[in-house]
């Protein structure tokens, strides 16, 4: 009898324990489901707020995006136009600015030719004395010609011809002497230097425009 009562009590205790476990497990499941639902609602609300903010920013930035797209298209058109210009310049070789002419002298070898620098030949001007002598010579020639034409006798013609030839030779010799004096005064270069002239393209931001000054022969000799 006691054994039967003990078994009944044990069975009732086990049944209560099982029911408590089931109820606790059901409560934990329901709590976890509620937490999951709360998390889902939070994520959905956060996603909705993010979408709303993005939509607002997109609506605000639509004119800016349109402006940027328009400016980018204009820049692309400008770049395309500049490329066409560059192609034309490369095709026709049109200089962008006035190039500088640079004369490069060719250096001669010293063992086969004397190196002399070419100078501009400046002939000296005639003075008053030289002009007066030339005028006197011309007057004498005209006087001799007039005297020879006026004479009629043969003997006088022969004598006049001889004197005329002598005077003409003297005039020629005097003119040659004057030319010789001026040729010694003038500077004549024995050999002319060969100058190769070519076109050199230089950039305007790294080149200073320098013009070659003309050298005066008289100043060079005085120095």
From Swiss-Prot:
Signal sequence extent: 1-15
GO cellular component terms listed in the entry, alphabetical order: extracellular space
Modified residues (Phosphoserine): 23-25, 28, 46, 71-73, 132, 147, 155
UniProt tissue specificity: Mammary gland specific. Secreted in milk.
One Pfam family it belongs to: Casein
Compartments where found: Secreted
Sequence repeats mapped onto the chain: 76-128, 129-223
Subcellular location, principal: secreted
InterPro entries (UniProt xref): Alpha-s2_casein, Casein, Casein_CS
Keywords: Milk protein, Phosphoprotein, Repeat, Secreted, Signal
Single GO term (MF): zymogen binding
Similarity annotation: Belongs to the alpha-casein family.
Role of this protein: Important role in the capacity of milk to transport calcium phosphate.
Protein's name in the database: Alpha-S2-casein
UniProt organism field: Cavia porcellus
The gene coding this protein: CSN1S2
């Amino acid at each position: 009898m006691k054994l039967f009562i003990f078994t009944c009590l044990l069975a009732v205790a086990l049944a209560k324990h099982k029911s408590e476990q089931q109820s606790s497990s059901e409560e934990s499941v329901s709590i976890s489901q509620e937490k999951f639902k709360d998390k889902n609602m939070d994520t959905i609300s956060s996603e909705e707020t993010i979408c709303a903010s993005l939509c607002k920013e997109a609506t605000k930035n639509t004119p800016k995006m349109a402006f940027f797209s328009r400016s980018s298209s204009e820049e692309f058109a400008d770049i395309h136009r500049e490329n066409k210009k560059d192609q034309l310049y490369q095709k026709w070789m049109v200089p962008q600015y006035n190039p500088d002419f640079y004369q490069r002298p060719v250096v001669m070898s010293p063992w086969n030719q004397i190196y002399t620098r070419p100078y501009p030949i400046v002939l000296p001007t005639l003075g008053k004395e030289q002009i007066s002598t030339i005028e006197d010579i011309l007057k004498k020639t005209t006087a001799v010609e007039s005297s020879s034409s006026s004479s009629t006798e043969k003997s006088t013609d022969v004598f006049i011809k001889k004197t005329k030839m002598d005077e003409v030779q003297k005039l020629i010799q005097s003119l040659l002497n004057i030319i010789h004096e001026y040729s010694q005064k003038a500077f004549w270069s024995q050999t002319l230097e060969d100058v190769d002239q070519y076109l050199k393209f230089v950039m305007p931001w790294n080149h200073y425009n320098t013009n070659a000054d003309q050298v005066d022969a008289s100043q060079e000799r005085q120095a």
